[in-house]
Structures are given as C-alpha cells and as structure tokens.
C-alpha cells in the first residue's frame, strides 16, 4: 500500500532526551524579550480566532516587503522554509534539480519525494561551488539549489560563482537562511535576475524557530506561480502576528546578531585549527567528538558522508564555555 519511494526514505531525526546543553539545531540562543511577547499578545487581541488567516498571508508579506523595500507581490511566506522548498522543487520546467553537497538535505528530500531526479555537483575542497560545472548541468535542470551560507559548512558562496549559474537563465534558489550572520547577501541581484529566488527564515537571526515562518523573495512572476500551487491558509494568525511585531524592532536583532558573530569568532579562535571559518551562527568542527560530548550532556550535530568525523556546533551563550571545556578534555583523550 505504501509507495516504495516512501519506504526508502529515512525520517528526519534529532536527538531527544534530558541533556543539559543543546547546540545541534542552529537555533538562536536568545528568546524574545517579555515586552515583545506582550506586544505579540496585544496584536493577537484584534485578530478573530474563529476565522481563517489571510489566504496568501498578505499581512506578513506586506510587513516583510516593507522591511526590505519590496512590494508584497515579491514575497511569499510559508510554514517554515521547508514548505516553500517543497513547492520550489516542483515549480519550474526541467528534467531534474541540481544540488551541491554537502549541503542542506531537504532540497533532495522534497525532489525525490515528488519523483524528481537530483543531479549533484559536489562542493570543491574549500566548500565553494563550482559555477562552471553547475551551469553546464543546469541546461536541462528545472532549478539549482545553492545554500549561502552553506549548511553545514558555514561559508558564503562566491558571488562570481553564483552569477555564472544565474546567467544560464534557469531558476536559481539561493537559500540565505543564515545570511544575517554573514553581512553580505544577494538582495541587490533580484532586479537584474528574474530567475533568482532568495529563501530566508525567521528561525535563526530572529529567534523564531518555534513559530515556523520562512519566506521567499523573487520576481512577481515566480511568486504568483508559487501561490497557484501553494496550500491556502498555511501560515497561521500567530505566526503572522509574530512577524509583524519582530520587524518593528530591527535594532534588537541587529545587536543580537553582532553578539552571536563575536561569540562565533571567539569560539573559533579557541578551537584553533579544528574549526573552519564560518559566516553563519554555527561552526563546522573537524572532531569525531559527538559521542564524547553527548556523554557529558552536550548535544551537537553529527555529520556523515564526506564530512564523517566532523560535528556542527551552534553558537550559544554561556553554553559555549562548557562546550569548549569539554573539547579540551576530548583533545587530551584524542592525543591532540
């Protein structure tokens, strides 16, 4: 009864349990301040709970558009970025999608779930994309998916390499989920390249992983097409109210981003050659230390495949010092 393709899938798993430090999901270490929560509750008081939310999430789209200086028609909002990825893999003409492993696995997941083949163009040794090879593979592709900063390696992709792919005219989805921590983005290319889709989220820099709100910035043509196939009413009234409120307080989040970046660099210096440079809110660490850390109540992300023997570590606050102390112990055990 169940499709063979579904039987072949491995469900997305995370570690659960009574651990003391969680550095595995790239969440913000900062909750919303009490006064912002109160503002959200006030916003919700005027919203009827017995009615469906706006069918295309227009209140949130307008707030995001105003924040970036874009019309709401250039914005799509989803129940997390994953929902939008699920539509984007199906939206464009072509024989397959192109991905650049090691990278975020949900591009391939949703493509294969929908019977769409996946062509992989691996990252170079320095984890940058090979724009020439991707452009060649893109000729028959429906879309190319590039994460910048890349998850799990943490690096921004060179603009000149992304441009090589954009010049093909094929749909290019650049996942900028962590871009606020990088200080550089591709927003300025939207007018020049109508085939560009920027995918972003409120889960990281805006401390809203629990609200599940992702969004896409793209040409009006792409956004209109996306809403032709998108489930109606998918972004609830709570999520839309939260978006409107947090975007009224950009200064708070800019300061938090600066603090996370400062901590990232401090932790990276402490780890020395074990840590790769990062433009995100996490570090890729060359250390087979997952089990060692777990035994000490510290949860990090264990990596596999090309990154076997590596871990991905979210930048926290005071948790960072406990992690660094445990890593010093691990280095002693490992003889480093």
UniProtKB/Swiss-Prot annotation:
InterPro entries linked: Aminotrans_II_pyridoxalP_BS, Aminotransferase_I/II_large, HisP_aminotrans, PyrdxlP-dep_Trfase, PyrdxlP-dep_Trfase_major, PyrdxlP-dep_Trfase_small
GO MF annotations, alphabetized: histidinol-phosphate transaminase activity; pyridoxal phosphate binding
CDD domains documented for this protein: AAT_like
Required co-factors: pyridoxal 5'-phosphate
SUPFAM superfamilies, alphabetized: PLP-dependent transferases (SSF53383)
Catalytic activities: L-histidinol phosphate + 2-oxoglutarate = 3-(imidazol-4-yl)-2-oxopropyl phosphate + L-glutamate
N6-(pyridoxal phosphate)lysine: residues bearing it: 204
EC number(s) reported in the record: 2.6.1.9
Annotated PROSITE patterns: AA_TRANSFER_CLASS_2
Pfam families hit by this protein: Aminotran_1_2
Keywords (A to Z) from UniProt: Amino-acid biosynthesis, Aminotransferase, Histidine biosynthesis, Pyridoxal phosphate, Transferase
Single biological process term from Gene Ontology: L-histidine biosynthetic process
Domain of life: Archaea
Recorded metabolic or biological pathway in which this protein acts: Amino-acid biosynthesis; L-histidine biosynthesis; L-histidine from 5-phospho-alpha-D-ribose 1-diphosphate: step 7/9
NCBIfam families, alphabetized: hisC
Entries under PANTHER family matching the protein: HISTIDINOL-PHOSPHATE AMINOTRANSFERASE, HISTIDINOL-PHOSPHATE AMINOTRANSFERASE-RELATED
Family, per entry: Belongs to the class-II pyridoxal-phosphate-dependent aminotransferase family. Histidinol-phosphate aminotransferase subfamily.
Record protein name field: Histidinol-phosphate aminotransferase
Organism: Thermococcus kodakarensis (strain ATCC BAA-918 / JCM 12380 / KOD1) (Pyrococcus kodakaraensis (strain KOD1))
Lineage, opening ranks: Archaea, Methanobacteriati, Methanobacteriota, Thermococci, Thermococcales
Record gene name: hisC
